[in-house]
């Protein structure tokens, strides 16, 4: 109870304390409200500032990223455009960044702020142009001291060339300068090789200037061509390492440059860079000076030489190197064209030499007079000797080939037409001046036989000329056969009887219904012919008997001037056979005539006796018409064959 009283006594004080606390809270609330009212603008401003700070920070990051991507540092710009700075890795890195910046400007041009993109693109274009100009000048400077013979060509210049290829105009200008420099260098080296002994401690003491062999045209031309070939191979290998290596990076650069410069295309055609062709063109340009000097010297050598064999060997040498240079540099190369034109020049000179030789022979009548023994004339012998040397040279040369078409034409065909055909024609003309047909045919045959013997070992000549020679020889052989046959008939007197018996010769063709006047005529009339009168027939028979013992020797002697015993023997044998056939015909006509006159009776023992006696007694004279042709012309075909065998 007492405790309750104490609690009740303290309640007023608790109420007072609570009231005071309430007042304090109210006061504090009032102060808080006032403070809140006073600080609210500050908080709002702070929030705005914080938001702005975030925006600024974001923009700062964007700006930093933009600057890092689109803006080069001062060092990079200086390395890119300053001529005082070297072309090193920093330059190429800066150039790569600048090209990327220029490409990425396309993104800016697609945004709302195109002005920024245009400004940056304009500035990057200026920087790129300055960088490529710096690179172009640096490459030209390096080219002046570049040693292509050094197997370790600077990697930096190879890298620079690949980068410069993205500017085709600058790249080609650079190549022009390079080609001019190399042309001068190679021309100077060629002149040195021609006239000066190589210097240096390790020089070959046996080495001599090329012009030391100028007295030997073939070696002189060969040494010059060999030097040019060696220089072309070395130049191509060096330039291939310089321009074509690294998997065609230069080609890719040029293609990229062409794609970036569509206005440089002709008629809108797609331009594709051909690396090997460009390399061949560059090597050709480098050798232009050497090519001109080579052409001049070879032409002088050709003009000053009158040996057709040497000229032809030079033609073969030029043909070999034309093929070699074609494989190395392509058919369109100026060097190949020059060597081909030198071949044409040499062949024209060869033609002139052949024409001069022909003119010299034709100008002297004694040269055209056939020899007394009807042998091959000296001018044709000389021409065949010359041709043999030419054929041997071709047979052992690189140009030797099989016939390239159905006509058998080959690379030697133009040569033989100049070196042989005119002289054969001249020999034929000379033979036409011989009045005697036999001598004319023998002389012509000897000329053709000598020609055939000369060309027979060489198939590439036989294929074009042997058929014609063979046909002509066949024609002449027929002529010789007729001559030998005619000789046998004339020498034996048999031609008189054959001429008289011509009406009794069987016709080549017979009509289906022969008339009384047609073949065969009455054989009994043969004895009335003047040629078959006793005195004439006996004279012819005696002439035949006088001729037969030496007939074979005489008829062979008729063609003794021919240089082919085999030909003489075969022609004579055929002529003898034809003579025997003619004699057999005459013999048959004589027997037929005697039988037709009733003057020949053939007994069982084979001996011929008269059907009528000349008279009743032995001492009586025969009647004028009681004679037999057979008794006046007793030779038989069998006897003739034996005597002429």
UniProtKB/Swiss-Prot annotation:
This is Conserved oligomeric Golgi complex subunit 6. Keywords: Golgi apparatus, Membrane, Protein transport, Transport. Belongs to the COG6 family. GO terms for cellular component: Golgi membrane; Golgi transport complex. The gene is COG6. Pfam families: COG6_C (PF20653), COG6_N (PF06419). It is found in: Golgi apparatus membrane. Acts as a component of the peripheral membrane COG complex that is involved in intra-Golgi protein trafficking. COG is located at the cis-Golgi, and regulates tethering of retrograde intra-Golgi vesicles and possibly a number of other membrane trafficking events. The lineage of its organism: Eukaryota, Fungi, Dikarya, Ascomycota, Pezizomycotina. Its main location: Golgi. Coiled coil: none annotated. Disulfide bonds: none annotated. It comes from the Eukaryota. GO terms for biological process: intra-Golgi vesicle-mediated transport; protein transport. It is a peripheral membrane protein.
């Amino acid at each position: 109870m007492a405790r309750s009283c104490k609690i009740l006594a303290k309640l007023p004080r608790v109420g007072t304390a609570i009231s005071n606390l309430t007042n304090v809270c109210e006061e504090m609330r009032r102060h808080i409200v006032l403070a809140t009212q006073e600080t609210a603008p500050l908080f709002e401003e702070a929030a705005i500032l914080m938001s702005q700070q975030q925006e600024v920070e974001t923009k700062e990051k964007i700006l930093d990223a933009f600057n890092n991507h689109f803006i080069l540092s001062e060092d990079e710009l200086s390395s890119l455009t300053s001529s005082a700075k070297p072309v090193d890795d920093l330059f190429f890195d800066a150039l790569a960044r600048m090209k990327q910046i220029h490409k990425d400007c396309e993104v800016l041009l697609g945004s709302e702020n195109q002005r920024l993109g245009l400004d940056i693109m304009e500035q990057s274009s200026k920087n790129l142009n300055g960088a490529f100009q710096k690179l172009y000048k640096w490459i030209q400077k390096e080219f002046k001291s570049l040693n292509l013979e050094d197997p370790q060509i600077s990697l930096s210049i190879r890298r620079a060339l690949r980068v410069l290829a993205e500017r085709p105009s600058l790249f080609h200008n650079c190549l022009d300068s390079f080609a001019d420099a190399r042309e001068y260098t190679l021309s100077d080296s060629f002149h040195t090789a021609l006239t000066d002994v190589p210097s240096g401690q390790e020089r070959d003491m046996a080495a001599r200037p090329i012009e030391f062999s100028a007295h030997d045209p073939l070696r002189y031309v060969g040494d010059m061509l060999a030097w040019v070939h060696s220089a072309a191979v070395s130049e191509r290998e060096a330039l291939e390492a310089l321009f074509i290596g690294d998997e065609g990076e230069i080609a890719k650069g040029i293609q990229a440059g062409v794609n970036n410069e569509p206005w440089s295309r002709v008629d809108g055609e797609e331009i594709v860079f051909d690396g090997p062709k460009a390399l061949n063109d560059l090597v050709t340009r480098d050798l232009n000076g050497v090519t001109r000097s080579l052409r001049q010297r070879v032409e002088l050598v050709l003009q000053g030489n009158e040996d057709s064999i040497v000229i032809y060997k030079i033609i073969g040498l030029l043909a070999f190197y034309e093929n070699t240079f074609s494989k190395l540099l392509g058919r369109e190369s100026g060097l190949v064209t020059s060597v081909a034109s030198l071949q044409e020049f040499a062949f024209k000179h060869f033609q002139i030499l052949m024409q001069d030789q022909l003119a010299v022979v034709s100008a002297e009548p004694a040269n055209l007079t056939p020899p007394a023994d009807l042998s091959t004339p000296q001018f044709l012998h000389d021409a065949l000797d010359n041709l043999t040397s030419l054929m041997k040279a071709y047979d052992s040369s690189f140009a030797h080939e099989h016939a390239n078409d159905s006509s058998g034409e080959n690379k030697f065909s133009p040569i033989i037409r100049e070196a042989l055909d005119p002289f054969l024609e001249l020999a034929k003309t000379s033979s036409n001046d011989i009045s005697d047909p036999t001598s004319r045919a023998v002389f012509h045959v000897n000329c053709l036989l000598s020609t055939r013997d000369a060309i027979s070992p060489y198939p590439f000549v036989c294929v074009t000329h042997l058929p014609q020679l063979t046909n002509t020889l066949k024609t002449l052989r027929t002529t010789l056969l007729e001559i030998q046959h005619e000789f046998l008939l004339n020498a034996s007197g048999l031609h008189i009887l054959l001429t008289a018996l011509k009406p009794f010769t069987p016709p080549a063709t017979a009509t289906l219904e022969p008339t009384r006047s047609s073949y065969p005529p009455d054989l009994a009339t043969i004895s009335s012919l003047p040629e078959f009168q006793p005195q004439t027939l006996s004279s012819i028979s005696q002439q035949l008997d006088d001729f037969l013992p030496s007939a074979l020797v005489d008829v062979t002697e008729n063609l003794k001037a021919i240089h082919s015993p085999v030909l003489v023997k075969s022609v004579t044998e055929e002529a003898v056979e034809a003579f025997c056939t003619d004699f057999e015909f005459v013999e048959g006509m004589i027997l037929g005539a005697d039988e037709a006159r009733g003057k020949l009776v053939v007994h069982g023992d084979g001996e011929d006796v008269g059907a009528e006696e000349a008279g009743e007694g032995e001492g009586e004279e025969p009647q004028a018409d009681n004679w037999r042709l057979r008794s006046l012309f007793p030779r038989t075909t069998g006897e003739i064959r034996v005597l002429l065998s």
